[in-house]
Amino acid sequence: MTVRLILAKGREKSLLRRHPWIFSGAVQRLEGDALSGETIDILDSQGKWLARAAYSPESQILARVWTFQQDEVIDCAFFIRRLQQAQNWRDWLAQRDGLNGYRLIAGESDGLPGITIDRFQNFLVLQLLSAGAEYQRETLVSALQHCYPECSIYDRSDVSVRKKEGLPLTQGLICGEMPPALLPISENGMQLFVDIQQGHKTGFYLDQRDSRLAARNYANGRRVLNCFSYTGAFAVAALMGNCQQVISVDTSQSVLDIAKQNIELNQLDLSKTEFVRDDVFQLLRSYRAQGEKFDLIIMDPPKFVENKSQLASACRGYKDINMLAIQLLRPGGILLSFSCSGLMPVDLFQKILADAALDAGHDIQFIEQFRQAADHPVIAAYPEGLYLKGFACRVM
């Protein structure tokens, strides 16, 4: 008999709106014993069936919904259906944008909570972020092998969020060939190296595809500063947009080395590039003291806020770094500024940029707004899925 989780009276409203999470505070009782990650049924206080979900006893999110259809079984066929539904959309995007690298599964928004899958050529990179996802590992891999027999599968479940689920960090080859140290992918006419084994996240920031295209369009004739550059995808975009110069800044020499290789891969002019290993905050202050000026600054920092208690300090960090950037821009210069934290509301981020401009002593115009690329969809019932936000700001 399936274990049943009974909600407290009145706590079913979010599920009726098809939100995929059940928090521990919404639960009245659990009927039966369930293993971590096991599939359970969710019922309201009157015993009405609501959903079928994965049980996560170590997490504040006590259950994550697999399905709202009572007759749907969570088996290999279920995962095959979800994969095929997701692939239909990615096929269209891949053809439109000339892609052989994209996010295949975006967790809750593709009906597979806690599961992230990126495809880079014929390599599938898997992140299992929840107890339910981990419990279904073998079944999911079987579904992937059925749908993508040509692909190797590599595990990058080495992310700290797994600790909140009581899970160990895992990484390594699941099946097929070991990925090369650097694998090139195509994006809007660019070739970009992906480091599947050692790179950030799954190896590359696919979510910034549209923002890179915007940077390319703004770059013509401009002197560009690319902050938190990682492997230089924004620098490649700027050079393809015929920038005057692009300076890429990161604290890691290894990613700057890959950035240089990316520029060489695209046969672009290395004489128009500079790579600086430094702390961005310190370098911006140094540039300000030296009177350096730029026409386009790309500000794409790592996540400043991991939990709500860090939000206030993150706001200060975002304001300070964007203030410095605005001070380095010539009149008419463009700032492309981003936040990748789901805990940072878009309206608050916009206010931070406005406050940064005020502190910098300049007026700015908001001329364009960004979000994650379309292979990272946001299902209507789960607004938390919209984590990446950005603005193009013109300095007056």
From Swiss-Prot:
UniProt domain PUA: residue ranges: 2-81
Cysteines engaged in disulfide bonds, as pairs: none
Keyword Transferase: yes
GO cellular component: cytoplasm
Keywords carried by this UniProt record: Cytoplasm, Methyltransferase, RNA-binding, rRNA processing, S-adenosyl-L-methionine, Transferase
Catalysis performed (reactions): cytidine(1962) in 23S rRNA + S-adenosyl-L-methionine = 5-methylcytidine(1962) in 23S rRNA + S-adenosyl-L-homocysteine + H(+)
The organism's place on the tree of life at top rank: Bacteria
Places the protein is found: Cytoplasm
One MF annotation (Gene Ontology) recorded for this entry: RNA binding
Enzyme Commission number, as recorded: 2.1.1.191
Classification via Pfam families: Methyltrans_SAM, PUA_3
Keyword rRNA processing tagged: yes
PROSITE patterns the UniProt entry points to: PUA (PS50890)
Family: Belongs to the methyltransferase superfamily. RlmI family.
Matching HAMAP family: 23SrRNA_methyltr_I
NCBIfam families associated with the record: PRK15128.1 (NF011707)
Purpose: Specifically methylates the cytosine at position 1962 (m5C1962) of 23S rRNA.
Name of the featured protein: Ribosomal RNA large subunit methyltransferase I
Native species: Yersinia pestis
Organism phylogeny: Bacteria, Pseudomonadati, Pseudomonadota, Gammaproteobacteria, Enterobacterales
